[in-house]
Amino acid sequence: MPKLQLRSLASQDKIEEIFERFKPHAVIHTASPSYMDTKKTLMSKNVDGTKALLEAARTCSDTKAFVFTSSDEAIMPTQEPTSEENAHRYDENNAPNAPNTYALSKALAKRLVIAANSEELYTSVIRIPGIYGKYDDNFIPQLVSSMREKEHKMQVGNNTKVFEFLYVNKAAEAHIMAMKALLNPSTRDQVGGEDFFISDGKPQGLFDFCRRIYAAAGSPVRPEEVTSIPLSVMQTMASTMEWVYWVFTLGTVQPSLRRISMDHLDTGCCWSLDKARRILGYEPVQDQDKVIERTMDWTMKTF
């Protein structure tokens, strides 16, 4: 079995070297910088890097399928179940409306992938929200840290916006489903050039979900224990911190409290999974509580 190969998305030559060596039948492109990274890095890796991968895949005669991972941030927020056809996407024409560079870069990369669909290379996009599960070293560990620092009884804003969430095993499963469908002559025309919403199918308030995580970790929070901080207050604090850091470090150091994170709390998403169910055969987790418990059992032993 081939060993892990590390290459930069900024290096066309290195990417082509990988394709020439391994001649992959399919590509699942999940790589992306952090949403907090610089504009230059995000556009270079997410847009130019995706373009480089598509070109390498297109010129490799063995490569027939390309699956790209997009984000909930690359479409405009919605609070009603929205289908792929009705979603409003960010692009070059409405770039000023994009909440941040990460959202725009993922949206532009998605357009490249869909446009590349052809009889030589079938392409598809899996759009995902926030992921949780075993081996998560970002979202869930942050919640564990807030528990240990006795901050888990606080919430920012009124928690009325709903968000989608996705168990990591289901995220992997959906990508594999799309890949297999693209490689199958009987299904590739249905899947090629299409994007699919994938989630647990259980939209809920962000802090409601967080409190389910806390409960599974042994630190339940009763409604009367919750302390709410107005979102506008935290947005102002975050903007002030960023300005102070910029003045004293010339932008070389970023504060842990970022305006982009606070603004995200005022977005949300709510999706219809009908298309993924109908075409890919995708089914979300049946018991979200069970996979949350499984996630926290691993997390509390690891962190």
Swiss-Prot record:
It comes from the Eukaryota. One of its GO terms (molecular function) is oxidoreductase activity, acting on the CH-OH group of donors, NAD or NADP as acceptor. The keyword Oxidoreductase applies. The keyword Lipid biosynthesis applies. NADP(+) binds at residues 8-9, 30-32, 102, 106, 128-131. Pathway: Steroid metabolism; ergosterol biosynthesis. Its main location: endoplasmic reticulum. One of its GO terms (biological process) is sterol biosynthetic process. Its EC number is 1.1.1.-. The active site is at 106 (proton donor). It is found in: Endoplasmic reticulum membrane. Residues 77-96 are annotated as: Disordered. GO terms for cellular component: endoplasmic reticulum membrane. It is a peripheral membrane protein. Sterol-4-alpha-carboxylate 3-dehydrogenase; part of the third module of ergosterol biosynthesis pathway that includes the late steps of the pathway. The third module or late pathway involves the ergosterol synthesis itself through consecutive reactions that mainly occur in the endoplasmic reticulum (ER) membrane. PANTHER family: DTDP-D-GLUCOSE 4,6-DEHYDRATASE-RELATED. This is Sterol-4-alpha-carboxylate 3-dehydrogenase ERG26, decarboxylating. The gene is ERG26.
